[in-house]
């Protein structure tokens, strides 16, 4: 009985200890976790209060770049692809047959009209000239003798010693001799001309190309192979095409130029449209439209004194047909495309942005004409547009200067000093530098 009683008491003690341990663990978990949660909540609350009080002060304004809409005189240009052609092109060939004795030009050389280019062996033509001159001397002597005989016959005819028939025959001999002398003179002139043709000269001023025949070859007149080709490049022409819808504007520009005794300006630009090569004027317009392409050909002339234009070169021709007065102009970067059409972001005195729908006109890679929706003097955003919403306030910054770009270390120092001296983050940052990202510590 006693042993059983002891076992029962030990069991109760063991159960009591286990229950006490369980109660202690549950109590610790309950009360300890609640305290931690309260502490964490308090910290988060405090952090939230700090954020609520200081977050607005630390949030940076969106940096943008801006420009002011201005009134300008804007020229209207029509652009078409063109080809440079020589004002005149001459294929130099020989007019006489013979051996090519000499070439008196350098390939690619600029020559003037009348300059000696080549020589054909002149000896055969010198011989022909000598023969013609000898024949002339012979026939001239015959003519002189016939004229003296005619004078004697005329005297004898008066005395009746010769018949009238003999007198007429002598007169015919004189006329025949006169004809022979004239023929001989023609032969001499022909021989002299052939001798002149043996010296080949430049018919026009221009640039000679590559020689097509070498010295020593026998050349015949009328051969298909030329000696050289000369292209006149001072001046030079550009033939370009424009759509037929542009014809009225071109005709009107010509009429306006005629009234003021002026010219219609034309510019030649390179194939990338980045560099202007030369300035000239409209020379002529073709008299019919190409029905295949719906375009019309135009020809412009350029002095080309600096030889920037070369025959068969492709260029972009820009013809000025009008000049808009008091046009409102903004940078091209300011105009955006939306579902409602073109628009710009404008800035008020407080640097708050507002969206304005606009109608655009003439534009190029740098500026665009605003036909409606904007007035001169209004400021528009040109950079940082992707961060804008209606009515938001922004910070207008200026582009980074060349000195800042050249010295990155000084730029970073200046930016750091500016950030430390202003309540708005990022105010000392260069205009085209990216906005500083918020770290995890700042977020918490």
From Swiss-Prot:
InterPro entries xrefs: CusB_D23, Multidrug-R_MdtA, RND_pump_MFP
Stretches with biased composition (Polar residues): 37-52, 435-444
Membrane topology note: Peripheral membrane protein
Ranges of biased composition (kind: Low complexity): 406-419
Localization (cell): Cell inner membrane
One GO cellular component term noted in the UniProt record for this chain: plasma membrane
Gene3D superfamilies according to UniProt: 2.40.30.170, 2.40.420.20, 2.40.50.100, Helix hairpin bin
Quaternary assembly: Part of a tripartite efflux system composed of MdtA, MdtB and MdtC.
Name of this protein: Multidrug resistance protein MdtA
Origin species: Yersinia pestis (strain Pestoides F)
């Amino acid at each position: 009985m006693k042993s059983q009683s002891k076992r029962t008491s030990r069991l109760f003690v063991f159960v009591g200890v286990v229950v006490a341990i369980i109660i202690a663990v549950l109590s610790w978990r309950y009360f300890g976790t609640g305290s931690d949660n309260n502490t964490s909540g308090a910290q988060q609350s405090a952090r939230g209060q700090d954020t609520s009080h200081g977050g607005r002060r630390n949030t940076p304004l969106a940096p943008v770049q801006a420009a002011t809409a201005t009134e300008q005189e804007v020229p209207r240009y029509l652009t078409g692809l063109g080809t440079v052609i020589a004002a005149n092109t001459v294929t130099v060939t020989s007019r006489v047959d013979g051996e090519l004795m000499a070439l008196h030009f350098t390939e690619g050389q600029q020559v003037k009209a009348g300059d000696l280019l080549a020589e054909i062996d002149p000896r055969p033509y010198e011989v022909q000239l000598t023969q013609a001159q000898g024949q002339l001397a012979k026939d001239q002597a015959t003519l002189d003798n016939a004229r003296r005989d005619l004078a004697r016959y005329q005297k004898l005819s008066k005395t009746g010693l010769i018949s009238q028939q003999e007198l007429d025959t002598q007169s015919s001999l004189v006329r025949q001799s006169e004809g022979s002398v004239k023929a001989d003179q023609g032969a001499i002139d022909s021989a002299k001309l052939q001798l002149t043709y043996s010296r080949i000269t430049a018919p026009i001023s221009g640039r000679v190309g590559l020689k097509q025949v070498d010295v020593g070859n026998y050349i015949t007149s009328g051969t298909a192979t030329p000696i050289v080709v000369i292209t006149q490049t001072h001046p030079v022409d550009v033939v370009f095409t424009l759509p037929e819808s542009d014809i009225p504007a071109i005709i009107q520009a010509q009429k306006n130029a005629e009234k003021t005794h002026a010219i219609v300006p034309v510019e030649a630009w390179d194939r990338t449209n980045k560099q202007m090569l030369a300035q000239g004027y409209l020379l002529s317009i073709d008299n019919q439209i190409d029905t295949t392409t719906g375009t019309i050909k135009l020809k412009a002339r350029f002095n080309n004194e600096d030889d920037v234009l070369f025959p068969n070169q492709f260029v972009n021709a820009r013809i000025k047909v009008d000049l808009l007065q008091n046009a409102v102009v903004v940078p091209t970067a300011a105009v955006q495309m939306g579902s409602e059409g073109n628009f710009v972001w404008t800035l008020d005195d407080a640097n708050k942005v507002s969206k304005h729908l606009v109608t655009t006109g003439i534009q190029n890679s740098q500026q665009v004409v605003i036909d409606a929706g904007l007035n001169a003097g209004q400021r528009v955003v040109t950079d940082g547009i992707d961060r804008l919403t209606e009515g938001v306030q922004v910070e207008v910054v200026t582009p980074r200067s060349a000195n800042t770009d050249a010295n990155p270390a000084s730029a970073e120092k200046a930016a750091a000093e500016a950030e430390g001296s202003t309540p708005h983050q990022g105010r000392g940052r260069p205009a085209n530098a990216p906005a500083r990202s918020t770290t995890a510590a700042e977020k918490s």
